[in-house]
Amino acid sequence: MTAIRVPRRRASADLQGGFDFSRPDEIVCGVDEAGRGPLAGPVVAAAVILDPARPIDGLDDSKALSAKKRDALYDLIVARASAFCVASASVDEIDTLNILHATMLAMKRAVEGLSVLPTLAQIDGNRCPTLTVRAEAIVSGDALVPSISAASILAKVTRDRMLVDLHERFPVYGFNVHVGYSTPQHLAALREHGPCEVHRRSFAPVREALDLMAGSR
């Protein structure tokens, strides 16, 4: 599907919520993911239908926000959204399907898990998962479309919290600091300790660490 390139401006007031008042029957959900690039942990996706009667100020691409601001917005989204769902694809699914298809699977699960059935899913990026509702991809949608911004925040905060929890099980890797991304600290820990069960074997740095451990035996 060809991605839609939206002009760099915020959505109009009629579209700030999940309902398009120019088309009264349209219920729009925003969809985004977090965690495609890390070497460890699941990929997480969220779908959000905003309530136009309960607007949320400050929504933006989660990567442009501080952790403190993301946490505050997370609570507001959960409290005020008409519907939301957060879903994931596991490390095993990432390694079996590849990261792109696992991401599409997580997005599909998020949309299908909504308590309100949308008529349109707006997806951040240039690809759409296979859905039973209409879908459109919006390049840079997480910075442009409020419901996608909200989804990006839910996905990012949820995944970061999951990796902090994984740090309790696997403290040598520093997941609480880098949340699985390929930092010098993480790569050094991989070389020293080898991968653990939540590392993605399909990612090159993890395979290289496995080969290094095998060669040292």
UniProtKB/Swiss-Prot annotation:
Primary location class: cytoplasm
Protein location: Cytoplasm
Cofactor annotation comment: Manganese or magnesium. Binds 1 divalent metal ion per monomer in the absence of substrate. May bind a second metal ion after substrate binding.
E.C. numbers: 3.1.26.4
Biological process (GO), any one: mismatch repair
Annotated positions binding a divalent metal cation: D32, E33, D124
GO CC annotation terms, alphabetical: cytoplasm; ribonuclease H2 complex
Keyword line: Cytoplasm, Endonuclease, Hydrolase, Manganese, Metal-binding, Nuclease
Similarity section: Belongs to the RNase HII family.
Protein's job: Endonuclease that specifically degrades the RNA of RNA-DNA hybrids.
NCBIfam families to which the protein is assigned, alphabetical: PRK00015.1-3, PRK00015.1-4
Protein name in UniProt: Ribonuclease HII
Organism for this UniProt entry: Burkholderia ambifaria (strain MC40-6)
Phylogenetic lineage: Bacteria, Pseudomonadati, Pseudomonadota, Betaproteobacteria, Burkholderiales
